[in-house]
Amino acid sequence: MNSGQLAEQHARTYLEQQGLTFVDANVRYPFGEIDLIMRQQDVWVFVEVKFRSSNQFGGALNALTSKQITRIRLAAEHYLQRQKLNPPCRFDVIAMNIDEINWLQGCF
């Protein structure tokens, strides 16, 4: 496993410990990708996992671009349409460094 895959696994475990239910991972379309799909009761949570080994250049919290946000939103819309679902949903970010994890809920 590479560091990105390990970070996604760690993020999944962390979110499950917080009471979320795992739905899917690494959902890819030509126009975007979703790292994790979780559920928190009736809310579907699309999670982008960002890992940085240091805080140099702003660390994990500053690693998400507006282009990536657009691509994640498109992928989530497509996923829900393919599943014929229309649930309440939100977009979270798990920002991880070597020594900490930050869970930002509903951040875009």
Swiss-Prot record:
<protein>
    <recommendedName>
        <fullName>UPF0102 protein Sfri_0388</fullName>
    </recommendedName>
</protein>
<dbReference type="InterPro" id="IPR003509">
    <property type="entry name" value="UPF0102_YraN-like"/>
</dbReference>
<comment type="similarity">
    <text>Belongs to the UPF0102 family.</text>
</comment>
<dbReference type="Pfam" id="PF02021">
    <property type="entry name" value="UPF0102"/>
</dbReference>
<dbReference type="GO" id="GO:0003676">
    <property type="term" value="F:nucleic acid binding"/>
</dbReference>
<dbReference type="InterPro" id="IPR011335">
    <property type="entry name" value="Restrct_endonuc-II-like"/>
</dbReference>
<dbReference type="InterPro" id="IPR011856">
    <property type="entry name" value="tRNA_endonuc-like_dom_sf"/>
</dbReference>
